[in-house]
């Protein structure tokens, strides 16, 4: 410690050594200490007078009443501190905390959906199957199997383990309950995501040949492809919708909506993933760094298909960074505004062929939402390449409109984009 008692201060000259009586002393020529007793210089011996307060040289920093909205001021050396009422904050208590309650700021504190009001403030809302609680921000389920929840974890009060497919891990049975598998004549075609009891979303490029939808089967509740585990529900497909602007062989608008011939039954192992509101997806979910991708795709490039459902956490990548990376490789498709990138450049973890159409699921405040569809990439976990996903937020209106449309047409149908 310094001579002023502050740690880290610059040391002053050494203090004189104490003599036998604890008083300052001097060293004689023989080296022995000789006590010295004399009054302090410049002051007569006797009791010390009380120190006279020295007027502050910098003046009263609170004299100008800098604290607003009822804040109280405390003068400091060359500065001041405002103590604000509960509803205000800021250096001068200038900010009403209610003004910070806007959706762009931490989702307005809402657990699910947030709406700003023109007159100021915001209100929270909940997805279908949930209801807003008395606190005005929390959402509680109103149905046995609400979307975006994982019953096998909820019932054991667990938390979804952080999975890290190529370089991935097995998704434990029931922990990816919205995962669908699309098969043609029993062979794996693509992955998919359950959005509602009769609706599954996948990738348009899975249906490049007529055969792929004529003999198409969708299975929910699947985990191990080698075994019948009793949780599987198999359905035929009545119709497949793809965007009218999708061009076969191209990568833009790579999304397909499948209507099952009859609804599945929700169980602990079959639960839909929430299709989020567009603004919530673009403003809030897009800022979540890691999301989970799952599927039975090849474990290695041109390798064997996984027999158990795999899952992997991938970080979202800035679109500009992905576009720059893609331009370095001749022949790579253009990354458009209808796509986003995620993954690692070191080739360690990626979605792979056979995972096409599967979910890119994002968790926010305990509920999972569909944010992407596995679309394309350069090989599997190829170095210097990210995985590319269909940006679901661009198609939410299209999906909702189709899910609310009744049609007797069957087969592969082109549906106009809004």
Listing of model-derived features with the role each one plays in the protein:
Residues 1-56:
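Extracellular mucin-like/proteoglycan-style low-complexity regions
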Residues 58, 152, 156-166, 179-185, ...:
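Extracellular trypsin-like serine protease catalytic domains
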Residues 61-69, 103-111, 327:
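Disulfide-braced loops of extracellular cysteine-rich modules
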Residues 70-72, 111-113, 192:
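Small-residue (G/S/T/A) turn/hinge positions that recur once per unit in extracellular repeat modules
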Residues 184-197, 250:
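A conserved glycine-rich beta-strand in the N-terminal activation segment of trypsin-fold
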Residues 200-203, 208-245, 269, 273, ...:
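Conserved H-D interstitial segment of serine endopeptidase catalytic domains
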Residues 248-272, 284-295:
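Serine endopeptidase catalytic core focused on the charge-relay Asp
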């Amino acid at each position: 410690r310094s001579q002023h008692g502050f740690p880290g201060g610059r040391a002053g000259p050494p203090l004189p050594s104490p003599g036998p009586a604890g008083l300052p002393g001097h060293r004689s020529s023989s080296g022995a200490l000789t006590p010295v007793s004399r009054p302090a210089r410049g002051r007569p011996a006797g009791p010390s007078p009380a120190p006279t307060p020295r007027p502050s040289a910098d003046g009263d920093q609170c004299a100008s009443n800098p604290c607003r909205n009822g804040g109280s001021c405390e003068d400091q050396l060359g500065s001041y501190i405002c103590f604000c009422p509960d509803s205000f904050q800021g250096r001068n208590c200038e900010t009403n905390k209610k003004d910070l309650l806007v959706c762009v700021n931490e989702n307005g504190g809402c657990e699910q959906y947030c709406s700003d009001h023109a007159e100021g403030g915001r209100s929270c809302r909940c997805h279908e199957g949930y209801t807003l609680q008395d606190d005005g921000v929390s959402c509680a389920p109103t149905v046995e199997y609400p979307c975006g929840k994982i019953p096998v974890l909820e019932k054991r009060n667990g938390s979804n383990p952080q999975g890290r497919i190529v370089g991935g891990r097995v998704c434990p049975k029931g922990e990816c309950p919205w995962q669908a598998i699309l098969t043609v004549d029993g062979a794996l075609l693509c992955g998919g995501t359950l959005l509602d009891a009769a609706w599954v979303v996948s990738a348009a490029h899975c249906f490049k040949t007529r055969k792929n939808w004529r003999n198409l089967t969708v299975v929910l509740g699947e985990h191990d492809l080698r075994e019948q585990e009793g949780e599987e529900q198999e359905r035929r497909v009545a119709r497949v919708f793809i965007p009218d602007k999708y061009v076969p062989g191209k990568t833009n608008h790579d999304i397909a909506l499948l209507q099952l011939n009859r609804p599945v039954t929700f169980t602990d192992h079959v639960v839909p993933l929430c299709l989020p509101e567009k603004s919530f997806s673009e403003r809030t979910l897009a800022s979540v760094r890691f999301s989970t991708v799952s599927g039975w795709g090849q474990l290695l490039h041109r390798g064997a298909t996984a027999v158990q459902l795999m899952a992997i956490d991938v970080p979202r990548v800035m679109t500009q960074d992905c576009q720059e990376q893609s331009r370095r490789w001749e022949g790579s498709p253009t990354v458009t505004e209808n796509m986003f990138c995620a993954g690692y450049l070191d080739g360690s973890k990626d979605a792979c062929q056979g995972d096409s159409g599967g979910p890119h699921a994002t968790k926010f405040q305990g509920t999972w939402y569909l944010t992407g569809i596995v679309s394309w990439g350069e090989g599997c976990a190829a170095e210097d390449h990210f995985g590319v996903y269909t940006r679901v937020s661009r198609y939410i209106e299209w999906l909702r409109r189709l899910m609310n449309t009744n049609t007797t047409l069957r087969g592969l149908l082109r549906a106009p984009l809004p």
